[in-house]
Amino acid sequence: MDMLMMWSICLFVCIFMAPFSCGSGSSSRFIQVPESQSIVENDSVDFNCEATTDPSTDLHYEWLHNGHQIVYDKRVYQIGANLHIESVQRGEDVGDYVCIAMSLSSGAREASPTAKLSVIFLDSASVQLLGSNRNELLLKCHVEGASGNEALQIEWYRNSAKLSSWQNIELDEHRLLVRQPTGSDDGLYRCIASNAAGRVMSKQGFVYQHQQQQQAGAKCLPRLKKNQKFLPESWGKQIFLCRGKRGGNVEAGLAPSPEGLRLVQGPDDQITIKEGEPATLSCLYEIPAELQNQRIQLRWRKDGKLLRQVELGASLPRGMGNPHNGHSLDGKDALLREDARLVLHKANGTLSFGTVIASDAGQYQCQLQMEGHLAINSSPGILEVIEQLKFMPQPTSKNLELDAAVAKVHCKAQGTPTPQVQWFRDGVNTTLPDQVEVDLNGTLIFRNVNADHRGNYTCLATNLQGQINATVSINVVVAPKFSVPPNVPMEIAEQSTVVIHCQAIGDPKPTIQWDKDLLYLSENNTDRQRFSFLENGTLEIRNVQAEDEGRYGCTIGNSAGLKREEAVLTVKTSSTGGGGYVTEESSGDGGFLATRAVLITMTVALAYIVLVVGLMLWCRYRRQARKARLNELSIKEAGGEQAGGEGSTSGNPKASEQEPCLGKQQRNGRNGKSKSNGDPQKSDDTACSQQSRASKKSAHIYEQLALPRSGLSELIQIGRGDFGDVFVGKLKASLVNNAQANDKDSDNDKQHSNSENGSGGSSGSTTLSTLNEKRRSKTSMDDIEEIKEEEQEQQQSQQQQQQDQLVMVKALNKVKDEQACQEFRRQLDLLRALSHKGIVRLYGLCREKDPHYLVLEYTDWGDLKQFLLATAGKVNTATTATSSTTPLPPLTTSQVLAVAYQIARGMDAIYRARFTHRDLATRNCVISSEFIVKVSYPALCKDKYSREYHKHRNSLLPIRWLAPECIQEDEYTTKSDIFSYGVVVWELFNQATKLPHEDLTNEQVIEKSQDGTLKWTVAESTPESLKEILLSCWSVNPKQRPSFSQLGAALSKAMQNSE
């Protein structure tokens, strides 16, 4: 309680003094602030931010977008202090960005100036009419887009000629003004807008006709109502306004066509012609002599739209006349386009086609019109085109991605009549493979693409004209994927060596290309003495220099596509360091800001003190209530036992605080009988002991395992496990002898403990005496051999008493993690309960202070997996420094069988003790120079063997070694250990050079394991006599798996046959 009060007072002082120590502590200032930018949509953008402080590593950076903290994903992420946005979107990323630099020591925050991000895009353009009369024509180019800080470029075109400010034409930004327009200004007006995002033309232009503007008149005439004959006298001086209907067309008042002007002959009613042949449409006309000087136009229309026209009478300098009965023509009413195939003959009005194409089919009509008069129309004629049989477009070869759900290859044929499309494989009249079909449109559909779909496919199109075919090649490829992507941002010291991994899989085999800051790297443009491009794609840089710092990108690609990942390399130079500085505040507002800061700080500190005092009172009340309950329970128990228990625990109250994992079992040992009296009220201190149900003598057992921390020496870290670091070191010989003596005492204590607990204990504690009897009866499958081995061990132990013992030390760092503590106790109980040659020995437990140390037996050759890799030539030496540097020869089949047999014996001992291992693999076994293999439990899941573990349901699991029921239901039994043992034998015959199912990702392994579709096969070098029993180890049904005794018998028989 006193410590808590002192801690609260210190915290209050720190909070109170925080506003006055900003200048001399770890305050920060920006040396690089983010700048406002305009980015083209779908491009990437980087906002740079850098602050300095003392020390320089005391900063944490955050980014705000429009006042809200950014949630990072694959598109928006932070690289160091900088913010990177991939594929900018105008709907999500536009706005204000602020960089926040926060000191981790003082909590002070500094915000950078706001940087604005604007997106440049360009969607569409259209021409709008703002005004049109006899004096001027005003058009506007309306653009859907944005150009940021740059101006939008607008270009105007009349027909196909580009316009500029000249004579009566003025261009002002988006507007076009034509002053005093004449017939020479007639035409189709379009605009083109362009910026950094691209260039777009208006989809619809504006057609201006000067003659129509002059002759247009309103058809709205003033008239009286039906029941009104006279105007009221009061209306004599009124002004009446006549308006046309809003949105309607204003038509010109046209006179009937003059006599004598007529069409003599129009096009035929039905004309049928083959595609590619010439065609002629007739239109004979007569013009009287008195009308020769009038302006008369001959027009051809297709499907109601103007196609061609020509002036027959007096010609104007320029213009299109007055087509379409006085209505203005826009893009929808005209088909005027440059086409050399179409020729309109002025002499006889004939429209001729050089070669007919399919799009020429339609309804044609000839029209004759005199200026200011109604048009004369011929009867329509239908042009029908017999289209040639052809592919539109031609089918092309294609690469299909393996395992794609659906892939399509199109084959579209056109012709008259409509052709029928068929597909064949490797020639004509051959059937298509499975999961390949053809739809009604002639599209070839592949479902669940696999390697059997490779080949040549022929598309055959037939109709009455004949048949045509096209052959395409279908290749099944695997898109490139990163098997080992580049590392996350790395920091490396100058003149050291860095390895940036980049490995890829795919079919065809992907090529790997490195670049630095978007500049390609190769052996020609790099220092070959420092840069090495390994065969698997990894980039190695030796003797790192300051100029090597940057962004390294790895691009993988094959015919199926490209993928790219980046890694940021930061080089720490010897001169790197932070200089102290003092932040100067303005003198004008300094006093007010300081006063406000002090008031806020004192208010927060006062509220915090009130909260702490309240918690202290509540904790004191809880502790007194708990003591009262414990005293009440102690009175009900035997008096002598109560006094002894209190003396063992209350005498050292700090021990339980320092030992959160094992101290609970001590208290349970004192109050062990309270669990059987049926009292529903149980204290918080016994919660963990209720789950473990250890005996009340467990404290005495742990005391027998106690080892002084000073007995350990030469500790070298070899990795990190799930609950702490793992070391290799040496244990004094005297402590090893004491541990061997304590083993005998612990066996007696176990029997005594079981007799006291009776039948009310758990399965693990009640069977210890039975286990010892079985161990002494020597009735298991390896009893006879163990008798001989024990004699050899006694001789070896006498020789080793004079030298220190090589040990493995597992540290429990996560003392507050209940799950880690539970697993620590499980491994401790497992190794403490077993005494077998195939299992590593438990020498003791160091629990004087945090972290706890679990001291286990270790061997001179280290873990089995590294030994297998060394014999396969994959590594140079074994794990430990004491191992020999002489290359090891490859293992023979007899040696592999011997290793598997020893592991089976050790696992059979675990089974007979009614324990499960849960992580059996070659990495968790050790081997000595005497070729003795023992089952151990390093479990280096955090670094060395992190690839062999996967986080599933908030736990790191070796999913490639686990049975399906372990992944689905978290159910571990001896049968699940047998499943893992089958994988271990697979590793042994493969020399541990491969991962099980290395062609599948971890997620795919989990999915197939849960579906029961994960297929296992034995290694190629496995003896025939073992294949059947090893395959049964991987049975989905646990009851169909063999026992370890059966596996040991099969291995023993195979060893005899191999000899």
Swiss-Prot record:
A Pfam family in this protein?
PK_Tyr_Ser-Thr
| Major localization class | membrane
Q: Name the membrane topology term.
A: Single-pass type I membrane protein
Entry's Gene Ontology cellular component terms: axon; plasma membrane; receptor complex
Superkingdom of the source? Eukaryota
**Would you indicate the residue range of the signal peptide?**
1-23
Quaternary assembly: Interacts with plexA; component of a receptor complex that mediates the repulsive signaling in response to Semaphorin ligands.
Question: For this UniProt entry, which segments traverse the membrane?
Answer: 598-618
Q: Which organism is it from?
A: Drosophila willistoni (Fruit fly)
Record keywords: Cell adhesion, Cell membrane, Disulfide bond, Glycoprotein, Immunoglobulin domain, Membrane, Neurogenesis, Phosphoprotein, Receptor, Repeat, Signal, Transmembrane, Transmembrane helix
Which one of the record's GO molecular function terms can you name?
Answer: transmembrane receptor protein tyrosine kinase activity
Main function: Acts as a calcium-dependent, homophilic cell adhesion molecule that regulates neural recognition during the development of the nervous system. Component of the repulsive Plexin signaling response to regulate motor axon guidance at the embryonic stage. Also component of a receptor complex that is required in the adult visual system to innervate the lamina layer; specific targeting of R1-R6 axons.
Record field: compositional bias (Basic and acidic residues):
742-753
Residues of the Protein kinase domain: 712-1055
Q: What is this protein called?
A: Tyrosine-protein kinase-like otk
A Gene Ontology biological process noted in the UniProt record is: imaginal disc-derived male genitalia morphogenesis
Phosphoserine modification sites?
S698
Gene name as annotated: otk
